[in-house]
Amino acid sequence: MASFVDKLYGLDGGCVIRFGDPVDCFGNTVDEDGVSYDGRGRPVDPVGYVTGRGGKIGPDAGRDAEYTRELGEVICKSYLANTVILPTHIVAAAAFEELRNAVGHGDLFVWLRHKDEVAIPRAQLAASVERLLGKLREEAAAGRIHLGPNVAGKDGAGLIATALRAFSGYHTQEVLVPRGEDLVLRDTRLLFYYQNRLAAHGLAFDGLAKK
C-alpha cells in the first residue's frame, strides 16, 4: 500500500471529475434556480408528470417505466458527451488495435490470450496514437468528448511516455513493457479495459457491438 501511494504522488496525472448539466428526475434540464425546462426550452412543473387525470399525484407503472427509460437515455447521452479521455485510454486503444492486427483472426478471447507475445515498434505505436489523437481532437472540437489536461500539446511519443508512467503507478502488473525499440503488449486484459472508454464513441474495438 505504501508503495502504491508513493507512486501516486509521483504521477503527473490526477483524478478527473467532470460534472454534466443538471437534470431533474424526468430528464429535463434544470437552471441555477431549480426551474425545469423541457426539450423545447419551455419551463415545466415536474409535478405535472406524476399527476393523474383526477388531479391526484400517484404511481402509474406504464407511465413511470417510460419516464425511467427516457431518463436513462438522457443520462447515457450526458455520460458520452462528458467523457474525459486520458493518455492511458488513447495508448491502450491504439495498442489493442495493433494487437488485433498482429493476431489477424479470432474473437476477443483469442486476442486476450496473446499476452506477452506481441511486440510493437514504439515508433509504429506512436504513429497509431497520433492518428487516433487526430480523430479525438475532431470529436472534442464538436463537443462530443473532452480531452484530459495531460493530453494537450503532446504527440504520440509523449502520450506513450505519460501512459507508461500511469500504468506503472496504478498497476503491479506491467501493461506495456519496453524492450529495445519495441513495446511488448503484456497485459492484454488491461489494454482492453482502458480502450473501452473510446468504444462507445466508435473509436476503439466494441465488444458489445451487434454483429
Predicted segments — roles?
Residues M1-K211:
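Membrane-interfacial terminal anchoring regions of lipid-handling membrane enzymes
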